[in-house]
Amino acid sequence: MAVFTAVSDSDLAQWMRHYELGDVLAFRGIPSGIENSNFFLTTTRGEYVLTIFEKLTAEQLPFYLDLMRHLASHGVPVPDPIPRDDGALFGLLHGKPAAIVTKLDGAAELAPGIEHCIEVGQMLARLHLAGRDYARYQPNLRSLPWWRENVPAIVPFVSDAQRTLLEGELAHQAAFFASDDYAALPSGPCHCDLFRDNVLFAHAAPGTGHDVRLGGFFDFYFAGCDKWLFDVAVTVNDWCVDLATGVLDVARADALLRAYQTVRPFTAPERRHWSDMLRAGAYRFWVSRLYDFYLPRAAEMLKPHDPGHFERILRERIANTPALPETHTACN
C-alpha cells in the first residue's frame, strides 16, 4: 500500500539475512493504498511482496498470516507467507511487524465484465466455506464498534446533510446488528476488502472455454470474522457498480451473486437483509475514507481515496436495491 516507513538498502540487506530467498535483484515501494507499507521484492528465487504493518500489532498479525496459509491449503489462491530462519511468519522491521509473502500471477481488472464477476463470486464462496474450520478468531476491526468510535471525530468536517446521513445510518445499522435476524446470519472469516485492485486475473489456458482465469485474492490485512453476507456486499459494491454514480450494474451483480450461490446458497435471513448489508458495506468504506481524508497520517506516497464515492453508493443503496437472485443455476 502507501509507503509510511522507508526501507533503505542496508535495512533490506539486514532483513533478508533471516530468509533463504537468494540475492535481491529489485525492490520498490507500492504507492497505492493507505494502510500499510508495501514493497515489490524480486530475488534470484522469485517475486515477493514485503509488507510493514503500520497499525496491526504483533498480537493481531498471526490471525491474518495463518488465515492465508489455511486458505491456501484448501485450494484458495492467496499469497503464501514465507517463514523466516526461525520458523516465524513475521519479524520486526524498524520496530514494526513485517512479513514477506509470495507474489501472485496476473493483473488487476479495473473494468470487470460478467466473466470476471462470475470468477470472483465462485471463489469468494469457496473462501467462506474453506474458512469454516479455521481455528483463530479476530473480529472485523472496521465494524460497528469502530464506526461508533470514529464518526464523532469526522462530523466536525462534513456538511449538515452528510452529518445527518452519517448519524442516521449509524443508528439504522446499530438496530440491524442488534436484531435476531442479524445474529442468525452465517459467519466466519471474511476478506472484508475484496475490491477490484485486490484480485488478480491471468489469461486462461487454451481449451478451457474461458477467456480469463482468476489468479488470486490478496491484501487480507482487513480480514476478520464477520457475516459472510457483509463480505458479499462489500464485493458487489465495488465489482458491480457504475463508478460515476454508484448505481448497481444489475447484470454484473446478478452474475456474481448467482455464481456465489452455485457454491453456497443464501439463507432466508440473508435474503431479507440484503439491502441492509449493502448499506453496511457502503457505510463502512464511507466512514473510513472520510477519516483518512480529514485525519490523514504522514506517508511518502499517500493517495487518499475519494470519500464521495461511497457516499453516493450509500445513498443509492438506501434508495434502490434489487433482491438477491432466487435461482441457483450454475453460471459457467
From Swiss-Prot:
One of its GO terms (molecular function) is ATP binding. SUPFAM superfamilies: Protein kinase-like (PK-like). It comes from the Bacteria. Pathway: Amino-acid biosynthesis; L-threonine biosynthesis; L-threonine from L-aspartate: step 4/5. It holds the Pfam family APH. It catalyses: L-homoserine + ATP = O-phospho-L-homoserine + ADP + H(+). Keywords: Amino-acid biosynthesis, ATP-binding, Kinase, Nucleotide-binding, Threonine biosynthesis, Transferase. The keyword Amino-acid biosynthesis applies. GO terms for biological process: threonine biosynthetic process. Its EC number is 2.7.1.39. Belongs to the pseudomonas-type ThrB family. This is Homoserine kinase. It comes from Burkholderia ambifaria (strain ATCC BAA-244 / DSM 16087 / CCUG 44356 / LMG 19182 / AMMD). The gene is thrB.
